[in-house]
UniProtKB/Swiss-Prot annotation:
Recorded name of the encoding gene: Tmco5a
PANTHER family (UniProt xref): TRANSMEMBRANE AND COILED-COIL DOMAIN-CONTAINING PROTEIN 5A, TRANSMEMBRANE AND COILED-COIL DOMAIN-CONTAINING PROTEIN 5B-RELATED
Family: Belongs to the TMCO5 family.
Source organism of the structure: Mus musculus (Mouse)
Expression tissues: Only detected in testis (at protein level).
Full protein name: Transmembrane and coiled-coil domain-containing protein 5A
UniProt GO cellular component terms: endoplasmic reticulum membrane; nuclear membrane
Lineage: superkingdom: Eukaryota
Coiled coil: 10-189
Stretches that traverse the bilayer: 227-249
Annotated localization: Endoplasmic reticulum membrane; Nucleus membrane
Keywords assigned: Coiled coil, Endoplasmic reticulum, Membrane, Nucleus, Transmembrane, Transmembrane helix
Length: 288
């Protein structure tokens, strides 16, 4: 009967150990996934910080600092959660060690029981009673240890559930922060695009105004040049007509018109000025 109880206790301990190992493996996998997600979020946050430092203004920087402070608080909570996980892992190692010790004890006890059965024929009833009492006391101790291990297992399971709940809440908080960061980033990108469009429209309007001004100045300079050219050509043609008229049609026009226009003093001065150039030197040409 004692051997059956010991075997059943051993099976229970082995199954509990396997369940505990599976739970701890799931916790480790969840922690690894959470660490990968946190690393990705940190890389995304660093990228957003870099972009915001390049294209941000003081108000946006202040808002980003607040968001960064919130993220740092979340990271600190995650670090505390990781420390709690490490503590649970250490406790799990302790439990595994105690379970292995208990298994070794059970193995030794079972071997003793087998040896007891083998030597049962050679022992006396008093010795058998003493050995049976020893086995009962050892079974009681093992049951106490098993109860303690069960309590530790329940405690670890509760902590694992609490940790899973904390991980879920932290993932929800990270998702909400990521959505807020993406929304802020999109708003900043939209405002930047709108400002770029307004600057482009303003530069286009300024270019159009400059084009209109340059075209107006070019047209004005062309009109002035044309007027000067036409005036010069008109005066040259008028002067040609006057010279032609004086040369071939009415050579005495100035002689007849100047006395009517100018006074005698002016005519005398004009005559003194023009007489040397109009007088022909013919003395050398006349016959002697």
């Amino acid at each position: 009967m004692e051997i059956l109880r010991l075997a059943q206790s051993k099976k229970n301990i082995i199954s509990l150990n396997m369940d505990l190992e599976r739970d701890m493996q799931r916790i480790d996998e969840a922690n690894q996934e959470l660490l990968l997600e946190i690393q990705e979020k940190e890389n995304e946050i660093q990228r957003l910080e870099h972009e915001i430092t390049q294209t941000g203004n003081p108000a946006e920087d202040e808002e980003w600092e607040k968001e960064n402070y919130t993220v740092m608080e979340r990271e600190q909570a995650l670090q505390e959660l990781e420390e709690e996980t490490a503590r649970l892992e250490r406790k799990n190692e302790t439990l595994v060690h105690s379970i292995s010790e208990l298994q070794r004890k059970l193995t030794r006890k079972s071997q003793k029981v087998i040896r007891y059965e083998q030597g049962d024929l050679e022992t006396t009833p008093e010795e058998s009673k003493v050995k049976l009492q020893q086995l009962e006391s050892s079974c009681a101790d093992q049951e106490k240890e098993l109860g303690k291990i069960m309590e530790d297992y329940v405690f670890v399971s509760q902590l694992c559930e609490d940790q899973a709940l904390c991980i879920k809440k932290y993932q929800e908080a990270l998702k909400r922060i990521e959505e807020e960061l993406e929304t802020g980033y999109l708003e900043r990108e939209v405002s930047k695009v709108l400002s770029m469009d307004s600057e482009r429209e303003r530069s286009t309007s300024l270019n159009k105004m400059d084009g209109f001004i340059s075209k107006g100045a070019l047209r004005f300079s062309k009109s002035i040049f044309r007027s000067l050219l036409f005036s010069t050509l008109f005066f040259i043609r008028l002067l040609g007509y006057l010279i032609f008229h004086l040369s071939f049609i009415n050579p005495d026009l100035l002689v007849n018109a100047l006395p009517k226009i100018l006074s005698r003093d002016v005519l005398w001065k004009l005559r003194c000025f023009l007489f040397p150039s109009l007088t022909l030197e013919t003395e050398d040409m006349l016959p002697h």
